Curated annotation (Swiss-Prot):
Xref: PROSITE patterns: KAZAL_1 (PS00282), KAZAL_2 (PS51465)
Cystine bridges: C16-C50, C28-C47, C36-C68, C72-C101, C79-C98, C87-C119
Species this chain originates from: Meles meles
Localisation: Secreted
Protein name: Double-headed protease inhibitor, submandibular gland
Length: 122
């Protein structure tokens, strides 16, 4: 089955039009009120979230207020073999944060962290 999209993927949609009053220019304050996107990146506030996600190839929503539990900002395609398991919302185990973050990217933000550690066996 394809990964869930839209509301099924979790997160809330943001009305970004309130931040770009002057055409397509965003006027964001430096006020720190972090939010975590469904791309597992922490943005300093909702306005910065809107500005930095407007040109993404997929729709990013706000997963939670505050910093992300798992930060996927700086990961390459090449992952180490470290073993620090994470359980994804798809029920799959990911050996480490790098592999999980690459899966988040491939899922276009539909995958999120279910829990730290391995998923429960059926």
């Amino acid at each position: 089955a394809p990964p869930p999209v839209g509301d099924q993927a979790g997160g809330r949609k943001v009305n970004c039009s309130k931040y770009n009053a002057k055409g397509s220019q965003f006027a964001c304050s430096r006020h720190l009120d972090p939010v975590c996107g469904t791309d597992h990146r922490t943005y300093s506030n909702e306005c910065m979230f809107c500005m930095l996600t407007q040109n993404k190839r997929f729709s990013v929503r706000i997963l939670q207020d505050n910093n992300c539990d798992i930060e996927c900002t700086q990961y390459s395609d090449m992952c180490t073999m470290d073993y620090l398991p994470l359980c994804g919302s798809d029920g799959n185990n990911y050996s480490n944060k790098c592999l999980f973050c690459n899966a988040v990217l491939r899922s276009r933000g539909a995958l999120f962290l279910a829990k730290h550690g391995q998923c429960e066996s059926p």
